[in-house]
Regions:
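Cytochrome P450
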Residues: 1-414
Length: 414
């Protein structure tokens, strides 16, 4: 069976199922298979991951079929580029997501979450859509897009539906494409207005700076604007799993509520990323032959990065199937050991939003840790990509519970 069919059937366990079907030992670092009809090599060992991220050995353009690539990233986006054009476009986008620029965005996330949490006592709350709204309002405001709350919620929902549909999950895939077409129309006009100074809060706002820096037409600039906004909203999947994990770990909840425990919150966020990545695999194409762990790679073969296998590899992680945030307090992972959003070095194809993801999760954990709640149904369907606990994780917050995080009472907080 083609690995693409196993992904549809088994979801996050697809590569493990493929390995078993080919009679490959569970601890094998590399094995050959087929992906969308092409010979493919699945890589998990460090030599394999290094080859996957070597720009002289692998390329991305045209590897992910347009029905998926264009849904999630948009036609003509950075994610399908290679070489100098990729580096130039990425520099423009990383500049907008610089460390100095992330502080105001994370502050907006914390403020939106504090305001939402104040309404939770005495209610049942579905965490995932709540985070989509909070993160969406935060990133749209930070970007300098002057939208009222209803419009911001609509844009956030449309961007989240693109993420929700990438796993070919039936109706979610259809909704995802409807939202992709909606966004491309909306964002093309928005990019033109931003470039002309007819929209936004000013020429120095992130959205305006980005569309001016993209050397392409308004449609492509709008696509890349979505690729700056959508990743923040996509953190809602990880934020939902952070809420699920926190409910089971009262000692960690107490610790993470302390405003001074930022490093502990970062460690918890890293463990959430390790155990619940967005996707089980990434794909590329080999541009030169090689032999990896005894498996021959031919020019033109597909390369499949086994994200789930790497992030749960016993050779890299002690007790890999246990949730242990403290592992990230003890040592920092290498560039090829923790790959929930891809690996390698920042100048290459490593996700430029990785730092943003961690900081948004850290702010989310600080709010969640300050609110007592119980989980109604923790069941998770691992065959669906991307996945959340059932119902987006419904939590019950008792009446009279504190509805704001420790941040809300700290000096200088908004």
């Amino acid at each position: 069976m083609d690995l693409s069919l196993r992904l549809l059937r088994h979801g996050y366990d697809a590569v493990a199922a493929d390995r078993a079907a080919h009679g490959v030992p569970p601890d094998a670092g590399t094995h050959a298979t087929r992906l969308v009809g092409h010979r493919a090599v699945v890589v998990r060992s460090e030599p394999g991951v290094r080859f996957f991220y070597d720009e002289s050995a692998a390329e991305r353009k045209g590897v992910v079929p347009p029905p998926l690539a264009w849904l999630l990233f948009g036609r003509g986006a950075l994610h399908g580029m290679d070489g100098e054009p990729h580096r130039d476009r990425k520099r423009a986008m990383v500049d907008v997501l610089s460390a100095d620029g992330l502080g105001p965005l994370v502050g907006r996330v914390a403020q939106e979450l504090d305001e939402a949490a104040a309404t939770w006592p005495g209610r049942e709350v579905s965490v995932h859509p709540t985070l989509v709204s909070a993160y969406g309002r935060a990133v749209l405001g930070w970007a300098g897009l002057d939208l009222d709350d209803d419009r911001a919620d609509t844009v956030a929902r449309r961007l989240s539906q693109q993420v929700d549909g990438f796993g070919f999950a039936g109706p979610a895939y259809v909704r995802g494409w409807a939202s992709r077409l909606w966004w491309d129309r909306y964002a093309t006009g928005l990019a033109a207005d931003l470039r002309a100074g007819r929209a936004g809060t000013g020429a120095d706002a992130p959205a305006a700076r980005l569309v001016r820096s993209i050397d392409a037409d308004d449609r492509t600039a709008g696509v890349e604007l979505g690729n700056i906004l959508r990743p923040t909203i996509a953190v809602s999947w990880l934020g939902t799993f952070a809420a699920l994990r926190l409910a089971d770990l009262p000692a960690w909840r107490e610790r993470l509520a302390d405003p001074g425990e930022e490093l502990a919150r970062m460690a918890f966020a890293q463990e959430v990323r390790r155990t619940t990545p967005f996707a089980p695999v990434l794909a590329a194409r080999a541009t030169r032959p090689a032999t990896i762990d005894g498996v021959r790679v031919r020019r033109g073969d597909r390369l499949v990065l086994d994200i789930m296998g790497i992030d749960h590899d016993p050779a890299r992680w002690e007790a890999p199937h246990e949730f242990r945030p403290e592992r990230f307090l003890e040592h920092a992972p290498g560039a090829f050991d923790l790959v929930p959003q891809g690996g390698g070095h920042p100048a290459g194809h490593r996700c430029p939003g990785e730092s943003l993801t961690l900081r948004v999760l850290e702010a989310t954990l600080r709010v969640l840790a300050g609110v007592p709640y119980e989980v109604a149904d923790p069941a998770v369907d691992l065959t669906r990509m991307p996945t959340t606990p059932r119902g987006g994780l419904v939590i019950r917050v008792p009446a009279g519970a504190p509805g704001r995080s420790a941040r809300a009472s700290t000096p200088g907080s908004a």
